[in-house]
Amino acid sequence: MYPNFYIATYENYVEENVIKSKKIKVVIHVGKRKKFIGKEKLEEIRVPIEFNEDDYDLLQINLDLYNYMHDTIEYIHEHLKNNRSVLLLGYGYKQEVDVMVCSFYMRYGKVPPKLAMYYLKTKKKNVFLPECLYEYCLEKYYEEEIDKE
C-alpha cells in the first residue's frame, strides 16, 4: 500500500508477528471488543465502530463510521509523515478497515471512491464481498473532504 502503513486482522496478526517484523509504532483498533495489545512503546487508539449483521441500520452505521473518518485518516497521515509505522487492525470478515484504507487513498491519492475501491481490490483478496456496505460513507467523505479542495 504505502510505506509503513499496514493492515492485519485480529485473526492473523499474532501468527504473522506483524508488530515486531514491521516495527509497528501505532496500532489503530477498528472495532469495539478486542483488548489493546498493551506493549510498551506501542501507541494504541480505538475506532469504536462495529457492523452488527443481526441488528443494524445501514445508513446509521455509515454515518457512524464517517464521523471517525477525518480524524482517523489525519492521525494515520501524521504518523506516516513522521516515519512511524502504522497498523490498522480489525476483523477479517468486516469491511471497516478496508473503508479506512480507501479513505486514505481518496484523501492523499486524490481519487474518487470507486477508484480507491478498485485499487484496494488489486492489492487484497476478498475485499467488499459480496458488496461494499459503506459506499454512502465513502461518497460522503469524498464529497465533503476531498472534492471541495
PLM features per residue range, with description:
Residues 148-149:
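Intrinsically disordered, low-complexity regulatory segments in eukaryotic proteins
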Residues 93:
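Gly/Ala-rich beta-loop-alpha elbow adjacent to hydrolase catalytic centers
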